[in-house]
């Protein structure tokens, strides 16, 4: 069994979700949202995000992590700030020795729903279906669980390819 941490980074709200994977079985462990004070200076918000993610890594001990890639919007300042949060989300697990993968939003939607054009509601519905018993309170947490599920699917495919290569 492998524990995966999915992260949907944001400077105001960062979603996180933990999933245990055993073969093709997924089991919800925990999820939530890290909220930073929107009135605080950016460095303080990044420190809050760092400390909270570090606490999650220490508390739950994931073996692998996956982070959603940043989309670029028209507001360059917002995109840059999102990039700061994403950097923290990539760095914390990496410093803990955890392998980190990255997935774009369309890849996550395709892995969870079957189409890269899925709506947020469709993604959340499938996350709830794939992880029965998960009590998801915010869309950010649902997105993070979707990132973890996406990584589980990609990981399983890579393991099958690797096993096939060894047998040949």
From Swiss-Prot:
The keyword Acetylation does not apply. Mg(2+) 1 binds at residues 8, 140. Signal peptide: none annotated. Mg(2+) 2 binds at residue 68. Coiled coil: none annotated. The active site is at residues 8, 68, 140. Its EC number is 3.1.21.10. Binds 2 Mg(2+) ion per subunit. Keywords: Cytoplasm, DNA damage, DNA recombination, DNA repair, DNA-binding, Endonuclease, Hydrolase, Magnesium, Metal-binding, Nuclease. It is found in: Cytoplasm. InterPro entries: RNaseH-like_sf (IPR012337), RNaseH_sf (IPR036397), X-over_junc_endoDNase_Mg_BS (IPR020563), X-over_junc_endoDNase_RuvC (IPR002176). PROSITE patterns: RUVC (PS01321). It catalyses: Endonucleolytic cleavage at a junction such as a reciprocal single-stranded crossover between two homologous DNA duplexes (Holliday junction). Its cofactor is Mg(2+). HAMAP family: RuvC. Belongs to the RuvC family. Homodimer which binds Holliday junction (HJ) DNA. The HJ becomes 2-fold symmetrical on binding to RuvC with unstacked arms; it has a different conformation from HJ DNA in complex with RuvA. In the full resolvosome a probable DNA-RuvA(4)-RuvB(12)-RuvC(2) complex forms which resolves the HJ. This is Crossover junction endodeoxyribonuclease RuvC. It comes from Gluconacetobacter diazotrophicus (strain ATCC 49037 / DSM 5601 / CCUG 37298 / CIP 103539 / LMG 7603 / PAl5). The gene is ruvC.
């Amino acid at each position: 069994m492998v524990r995966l941490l999915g992260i949907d980074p944001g400077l105001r709200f960062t979603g996180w979700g933990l999933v245990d994977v055993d073969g093709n079985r997924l089991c919800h462990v925990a999820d939530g949202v890290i909220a930073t004070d929107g009135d605080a200076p950016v460095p303080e918000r990044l420190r809050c995000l760092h400390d909270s993610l570090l606490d999650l890594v220490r508390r739950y001990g994931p073996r692998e992590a996956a982070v959603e890639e940043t989309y670029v919007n028209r507001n360059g300042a917002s995109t840059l700030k999102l990039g700061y949060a994403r950097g923290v989300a990539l760095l914390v697990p990496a410093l803990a020795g955890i392998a980190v993968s990255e997935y774009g939003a369309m890849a996550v939607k395709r892995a969870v729903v079957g189409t890269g054009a899925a709506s947020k509601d469709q993604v959340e519905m499938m996350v709830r279906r794939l992880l029965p018993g998960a009590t998801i309170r915010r869309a950010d947490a649902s997105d993070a669980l979707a990132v973890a599920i996406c990584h589980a699917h990609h990981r399983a495919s890579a393991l099958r390819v690797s096993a096939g290569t060894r047998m040949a």
